[in-house]
């Protein structure tokens, strides 16, 4: 049986495209904010259990069994997030941590009932696709960083990063909102966006975790 820690590693691998390509341990270390030796040790355990495969100098990739299990975790997590917002009236920046706790403690039957009562939703509150039939492909994949000054875009997806969600909420920016790309500063690695004449500064790191499409 997988521990919560191992499941979090599997989700991190998938978040870095580890279903179709190899992810370096260094990248995982940065993503999880965990020291490289600890990452290497955990990857070894996951490989021994059959959830990942590794290749020297390339990194780690989910096995078929690992992908199946990871998609199940993500489905649980995203359904829980939606339930917490729609039924229990949580804010979108609050649900990620709650779902992280609950996703490991609910049965398959509970997930089925949750899915049904929510009418089989396509996306979570942050715009992420809810996996179905072992299929997973995010619908919105173009980050804000890829747009140019003057572009007007609609926010479609934001990664589950609590600090980023809190910041966006403080600026009244959410899924479905239109913003204009004002300028980008390569030297400082920040960009400025505007919504309803309110200016918001985003680091490039944050902008890479916000996905949009042209209005």
Residue ranges and their predicted role:
Residues 58-77:
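Basic, amphipathic "hinge/linker" alpha-helix immediately C-terminal to the N-terminal HTH DNA-binding motif
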Residues 19-27:
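Short acidic, hydrophobic short linear motifs in intrinsically disordered regions
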Residues 37, 93:
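Key DNA-contact positions within bacterial/archaeal DNA-binding proteins
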Residues 103-211:
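Mid-protein regulatory/catalytic core that forms ligand/cofactor-binding pockets
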């Amino acid at each position: 049986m997988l521990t919560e820690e191992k499941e979090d590693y599997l989700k991190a691998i998938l978040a870095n495209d580890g279903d179709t390509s190899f992810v370096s341990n260094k990248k995982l270390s940065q993503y999880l904010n965990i020291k490289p030796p600890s990452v290497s040790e955990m990857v070894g355990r996951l490989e021994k259990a059959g959830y990942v495969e590794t290749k020297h100098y390339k990194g780690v990739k989910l096995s078929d069994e690992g992908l199946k299990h990871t998609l199940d975790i993500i489905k649980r997590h995203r359904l829980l997030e939606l339930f917490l917002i729609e039924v229990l009236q949580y804010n979108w920046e609050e649900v990620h941590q709650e779902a992280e706790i609950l996703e490991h403690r609910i049965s398959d039957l509970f997930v089925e009932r949750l899915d049904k009562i929510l009418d089989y939703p396509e996306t979570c509150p942050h715009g992420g696709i809810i996996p179905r039939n072992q299929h997973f492909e995010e619908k919105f994949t173009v980050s804000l960083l890829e747009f140019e000054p003057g572009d007007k875009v609609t926010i479609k997806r934001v990664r589950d990063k609590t600090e980023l969600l809190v910041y966006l909420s403080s600026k009244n920016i959410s899924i479905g909102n239109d913003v204009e790309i004002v300028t980008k500063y390569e030297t400082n690695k920040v960009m400025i966006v505007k919504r309803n004449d309110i200016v918001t500064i985003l680091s490039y790191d944050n902008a890479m975790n916000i996905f949009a499409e042209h209005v």
